[in-house]
């Protein structure tokens, strides 16, 4: 939340002012630092910056951000924000600054560096910030040497482990480890509870857990801000929380807390109480509405019930934001809320009231700016022009309200900036007056039955609308001329047709355009090359993709799949250094594989399937393909040829490690548009997965998929594919691959779908496949495989068709027995266990004796063992996937 970030920044500034006595140079005169710094310090700083790519730094004043002690010449403060790119190594010159008291290196790109134990040598540090800089792995225990630290900020990295490094940091007043992967049980002996001077503690978005919030939090009685959002805390909030009498902000959302609401009545300084997304039950204490400084209260998404009582003295309440949606209140709750006359934000969404809500009940809330009644039953009469609701409203959300007519009451809301009417039954046309609302900037009216636009197109063109989302309606005909101020326009799944109008080229503020799933024809206008996101999927567009991408083009995502495009892939795409997503699948593009795109540093998804790509898939130098950030590569249904070198997958760095799925789960475009409301926009791909073709919205950033099926690839499957630990789906079917199935498949622990059918693979199916506990689909049919099918839950659950067409394969689920007879009928588990035990003893004796009576029989059995691996030799320990 913005309030939390403001609190942290304020505290850091306060601490920095304490770190900077008069012997230091002031912040507003950094140039003086150059004259005060000793020659060795100047040399060390120059060496430090030379270790990185510093193109983002302020080169007009290279010493900006450096402070030196005017008596000793030692660097005592270093601040380089969003400036450095490269690996921070243990032998870095940074660790020569032994007199540093403040080190601020936030928002740099240290490219997945581990935090060096050498930081523990900087034992004069009082303020250390390494937030949002790409650090991973555990924080070294040497941090416990930094006993002078007052502030430690490690937020927004990929750090793991526990908080044991905080031991001995007894002077710590600010600790922020939010948005990482720290984990473990917070028990009473945790080093966290030894920080008796802590005033700001942020554990948000980690994996901490406890059967209840530890009582020991109540001992940190100097705390002013406590945030444990989005962890795995269970149970009740302890009564000791009432000991934190200095607390001004308390954030507990998105955990598993139960019981009654925490006792906070004694926390008279509390201004923010955020309890969203838990399992709190019972009623709301009326005292919450009269707390002297409480301005923000979110109880949304719990199991609260009963009625709401607001004392008559509540007119003096400072409560400005109240979020009560998604609970189970009973009886009349709106009248009491109308007493809170200072409210600016009110969320009562999805309350499932048994009576219609009359909007005029909110007429007393003269300061109301935001009202969310989504999912509620709204009185039809209150949506007419005669109804009265506060004219101050800027945001109005009425989604999922079963509204059938466009609300005329909007005409009176001249301050309205944000409208959300999605998932209703509104039919007819957009009224002309809507676009005349003077401050209207964001309109979300998706999933309705609207067919067109009333009146003159000039009204829409001259409106103030910047964000317009009209997905899944019945809009038809030509695309209307968009507002001159438009920034985001989405009309997915409508019936628009004809050419994309060239007037769109005059919309200089347009960043996102999504016209997917319509009936547009003709060419793609070249001017659209300047967008951030361009989505034209599943239309009838023709011609070639414009080759108009100039240097530093901001394009992040281009999807023109499922059209009738021809020609070649634009060579100028190499200029799109920010490109993350490229889809041209299911067209008629005829070209060689675009090896040049591996130079794009951020490309994560490349979809080329069902075109006319031809020629070798291996690079001209026969080395690794080398897409550093690529996670999804689909090239199925082309005419690509050749073999894959043994190191083909070596440089696929992003696919070689898995990520925590709680953070950055999907490829998404996000933008704050009003307060806590965000515009989110997800990528979509068509994926052949587990033998089925499916459309997948919300593309994961934490997993990888590869589809090379339906080409003319040959040779062996490279063992280097076992490096791709994030791989969940692999399809190499319908090629001419030969050789053995790689043993390295056993390393693909996240694999869920594997299709190797219709190749010329030989040898046996690796036993390691049965250890892949997530593997739900396997198809190795129509190859030249031999031997027994490995027995395991993931393998034996496959249909017989997944193994057919291999003359030498035997064992379940095929009927062919590995001992030359038909597979015996199913037995009861006990009988089968006894028989297998007897068989195991018999066969081992036959092999071990070797000589004596029955020598020939023993040799025959030994030969069978060497060829087929009997079922009873497979020792199975498979853990089922925990759903």
Curated annotation (Swiss-Prot):
Alphabetical UniProt keywords: Cell membrane, Glycoprotein, Leucine-rich repeat, Membrane, Receptor, Repeat, Signal, Transmembrane, Transmembrane helix
The cross-references to SMART domains, in alphabetical order and at most eight, read: LRR_TYP
Q: Which residues does UniProt assign to the signal peptide? A: 1-21
Q: SUPFAM superfamilies from the xrefs?
A: L domain-like
- Which residue ranges traverse the bilayer? 847-867
Look up and give the membrane topology term.
Single-pass type I membrane protein
Residues exposed to the Extracellular side: 22-846
Entry GO CC: plasma membrane
- Parts of the chain on the Cytoplasmic side: 868-883
Q: Chief localization class? A: membrane
Matching InterPro entries: Leu-rich_rpt, Leu-rich_rpt_typical-subtyp, LRR_dom_sf, LRR_R13L4/SHOC2-like, LRRC69/RLP
- Specify the superkingdom: Eukaryota
Q: Where are the glycosylation sites?
A: 58, 91, 109, 145, 189, 207, 243, 266, 305, 312, 352, 462, 506, 519, 575, 731, 779
Q: Where in or outside the cell? A: Cell membrane
Q: Which Pfam families match?
A: LRR_1 (PF00560), LRR_14 (PF23598), LRR_8 (PF13855)
* Ranges: LRR repeats: 97-121, 122-143, 146-169, 170-195, 197-219, 220-244, 246-267, 268-291, 293-316, 317-340, 342-364, 365-390, 391-412, 413-437, 439-462, 463-486, 487-506, 507-528, 529-552, 554-576, 578-600, 601-624, 627-651, 701-724, 725-747, 748-772, 774-797
The UniProt family comment states: Belongs to the RLP family.
Official protein name in the record: Receptor-like protein 40
State the gene name recorded for this protein. Answer: RLP40
